[in-house]
Amino acid sequence: MAKKVTAYIKLQVKAGQASPSPPVGPALGQRGLNIMDFCKAFNAGTQKIEQGLPIPVVITAYSDRTFTFITKSPPASILLKKIVGIQSGSKRPNTEKVGKVTRKQLEDIAKTKELDMTAADLDAAVRTIAGSARSMGLVVEG
């Protein structure tokens, strides 16, 4: 018989830095899941990703207090800020530009996020990422 799913927990945890402190501890603790098991498994699973990069994770909690989790690619805004070298996007993106991004850089980000996006092809994914860049106050070249 299949295990009964009791909850889906969505979090953003820094790669290789999962610890029992918030947001991980309270989210898993209130569902009765073993926090340290998740932290060890998550940190082992994100070893190859740059440390400190926020990684979205979806944890599936089961009725017998076990869990599984799926990690996703980092948010596009984080990747864009990293490539351009800025701390935050523009407060007024239509009038105040904070940096430039090329089509090649957008393609690299789209390839990284390809599995998590619903875009039909790479070009559609690039257009989606370009929209995110524009809304952050970045100039899209190419």
From Swiss-Prot:
Key words of the record: Methylation, Ribonucleoprotein, Ribosomal protein, RNA-binding, rRNA-binding
Q: What does the entry report about post-translational modification of this chain?
A: One or more lysine residues are methylated.
> What domain of life does the UniProt record list for this protein's source?
Bacteria
SMART domains listed in its UniProt record: RL11
Entries under InterPro entries matching the protein: Ribosomal_uL11, Ribosomal_uL11_bac-typ, Ribosomal_uL11_C, Ribosomal_uL11_C_sf, Ribosomal_uL11_CS, Ribosomal_uL11_N, Ribosomal_uL11_N_sf
BP GO annotations: translation
GO-annotated molecular function: large ribosomal subunit rRNA binding; structural constituent of ribosome
Q: Name one GO cellular component term.
A: cytosolic large ribosomal subunit
The subunit field of the Swiss-Prot or TrEMBL record says: Part of the ribosomal stalk of the 50S ribosomal subunit. Interacts with L10 and the large rRNA to form the base of the stalk. L10 forms an elongated spine to which L12 dimers bind in a sequential fashion forming a multimeric L10(L12)X complex.
Q: What does this protein do?
A: Forms part of the ribosomal stalk which helps the ribosome interact with GTP-bound translation factors.
What is the similarity comment for this entry? Belongs to the universal ribosomal protein uL11 family.
Indicate what this protein is called per its UniProt record.
Large ribosomal subunit protein uL11
Which species does the entry assign this protein to? Answer: Xylella fastidiosa (strain Temecula1 / ATCC 700964)
